[in-house]
Amino acid sequence: MNTRERKMLDLMKKGKQEFGYLAVKAEFEAEGTRVDELLRLVEICRKADLKFALKIGGCEAMRDLIESKQIGVDYIIAPMVESPYALTKFAEAVGKVYNDEEQEGVDFLFNLETISAFAHLDEMCAETKKAKELCGVVFGRVDFSLSAGLGRDAINGKEVTDYVLKTAAKCKELGLDLVVGGGVSSDSIPVLKEMVAVHLTRFETRKVIFDAQSANAAHIDQGLLNAVHFELLWLLNKRDYYAQIGNEDAKRIDMLEKRWEVLNS
C-alpha cells in the first residue's frame, strides 16, 4: 500500500466504527473499473473489514459475474433492468455462475433507475420475490430523475422522493431489500430519513455503502464528507497509478526514436 491508500484505509476504518459504513463499491458499468483498480479497492475493503459491492455491466453480463465470483464480491447489482423479462435473465445468469451454496454468501440486486422500469414496479418486485437468486432493489435516483425529464437537481425533491417511497412500500410488503443511491449528499439527509421511516436497508454514495439507520445518526453529515474524501483520494490514486504506467517506457521510447531518426536518415 502507498501512503494515499493507507489514508483511504484509515477513512474506511473510521467510517465503519463511527458512521455506519457497510461496504465499498465499484462499477464495471458507468465507471468502467479495470480489474487492477478493482483489486486495489478490494484490498482496502478487506483490511477495513467491510463488504464489497460491484455493479456489473448488464443483466446478463456473464464475464462480470464470473470475475465477481473469482474476486469474492458480497453485493452484485445489475444496472438498467427495464422489464420483468430482463430481471428473469439476470436471475438465470446468476444461477449459471453461482450454485445454490455459493449464492448464500452474496446478495444480488437490480437497479431500478428509469421511469419505464417503475411502470413495472409491481411485476418486477414480484419477480424478485419469486427468484431465489435475488433479494432486492437499488433505486438509482439520478438516472431515474433524468429519465422522467426532471433533471438532476430534482433528486432530493418531492416527486422523485415519492417514487422512492412507493418503491419502499412495495419492498417492505414483499420483504425485499431496498438500497437508495444517486447523488447522495448532506442535502439528501432529510429525504433519507423519510425513506428509513417507510423501509430502507442501505444507501450509497459513489464509493461507499451505509447502513440505512445511520441516516438518523447525529454525525451523518461527517460520514458523508468522509466518503467524499475517500472517493477523491481514490481518483487521485488512480490518476497517479496510470500516469506511472504511462511513463514506464518513456526513456526507452526516447532512445528508440533517436535511433530510428539516425538509421532512417
Predicted regions mapped to residue ranges:
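Expand to "…catalyze enediolate/carbanion chemistry for C-C bond making/breaking, isomerization
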Residues: 1-265
